Amino acid sequence: MPFAQVHYPFENREWFDNHYPGDFIVEYIGQTRGWFYTLHVLATALFDRPSFTSCISHGIVLGDDGAKMSKSLRNYPDPMGVFDNYGADAMRWYLLSSSILRGSDFAVTEEGIRDTVRQVMLPLWNSWYFLSLYANAEGKSGKVDFSSDNVLDTYIFSKLHHLVNDTTVSMDAYDLFNACQQVRTFLDVLTNWYIRRSRNRFWSGDQQAIDTLHTVLDVLTRVAAPLLPLITEQVYIGLTGNRSVHLTEWPVAADIPVDNELVIVMDLVRDVCSTTLSLRKSHSRRVRLPLASLTVASPLALGLQPFVSIITEEVNVREVKLSADVAGVARHELQVVPAALGPRLGSDTQKVIVAVKKGDWKQQGEVVVAGGYELQPHEYQLKLLAAVGDADTTASSALPDGKGVVLLDIALTPELLAEGTARDIVRIVQQTRREADLGVSDRIHLILGLPEDVAQQVAPFADYICAETLAERLSYNADAPRTTDLDGTPIYVAVERLR
């Protein structure tokens, strides 16, 4: 933006005409008057045009004590220590994804940088490691291919389409904060939904699954490269063997297939599962313990029918019931926003507040009327509250964004408890396999030492235990020393590789 530095107008007139006004400028918020404003005044006076077209005004970087970062106070993590322990990408992402790029002050802490590694960098790296592990185990390699019609593949491609589209919009607007949030959200879907739900396909060497994850990582590394330049470079080179992710073209959303109806339904499936798992946690029902039933009431409930099996597995219930009758199991609660009502209604705002408290309001289609006043969308919040049933047998909660409610049967029976114990044994055996450094496809001889009551309890689930742990032989040794804890009960677990 400064023109004197290029000796304008005595030299470089053509260069200046092609480079002014500037595309982008960034300074901390204290330069609003001293720099941003001054540049515009000069440009307007001399050229009758703005000095720049886009601007980021960041906040003040604070130390971990909340005071302004200071060399004399040393109130910040040692930069070289941060780079050595967490990498430069961690610091870069930590700042780009923070509120500092939206003008807020921001305290830099080592804990926050460490969270970046856990929440962003490790999921990306682990996704690549997972693909390479199972592809190599089957002697297969992946390729870019969007042709799979598997429902999970279609879903992750659709989410990838939206990631590319939304991140492109954010980047074009210099909104790095939103770009980071979009990448973080996609990584959560990729690792905690797509990969986890597709594990059996990778175990069996499904080429479509391998190609899909290869394709997703190819596009994802290119999208995230400006934000995480080092780790995306290593993942991309390992994935493709090409020279550099930074020499590739930016992805185009139109090249990626999308099924928006599937996205709506599958996002609802994920909301149902996460809400139900939260209910389990709050009522001390561990995930491996099966429960009798889950009821989902939502206007979109019938669209969930093809995915009932997924919900059943995710939340570990015997039966999923779907209902479009939300009113029968939930009610709406209206909350007005006085700060938004005041400028329009003045002293009548209090009348609306009193009317809402008395229940004198109604919803007519998309319109909400309270105390005789029609409310504007920004003047209220309409929350869906699940009806409270028998607290000993039923747990309920509303879904995000008022999409419906879930009701979970939390009553326990001896049969459910027995299956839960079998699932706990599977978890312990899997941990034992890892400690024995067994390969993911190694078959085993499983030896268990269980108290008599536990052995009788899990006997009907012997085939399940063997299938889940790749055990081709199952033996019992009642006299073996029981040093492993099974929910407070000591048991014995040993594994032997068969091949």
Where do the protein language model's features map onto the residues?
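A short glycine/serine-rich beta->alpha loop
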Residues: 20-31
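Cytochrome P450 core scaffold surrounding the K-helix E-X-X-R motif
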Residues: 4-13
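Short Ser/Thr-interspersed hydrophobic loop/turn segments at strand-loop and sheet-helix junctions
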Residues: 38-45
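Acyl activation and transfer enzymes in specialized metabolism, enriched
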Residues: 30-34, 422-423
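Feature 926 captures the class I aminoacyl-tRNA synthetase adenylation module centered on the KMSKS loop
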Residues: 1-2, 46-88, 107-108, 112-499
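Structured mid-domain segments that build the active-site/substrate or prosthetic-cofactor binding neighborhood
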Residues: 96-97
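An acidic, gly/pro-interrupted, aromatic-rich
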Residues: 70, 100-101
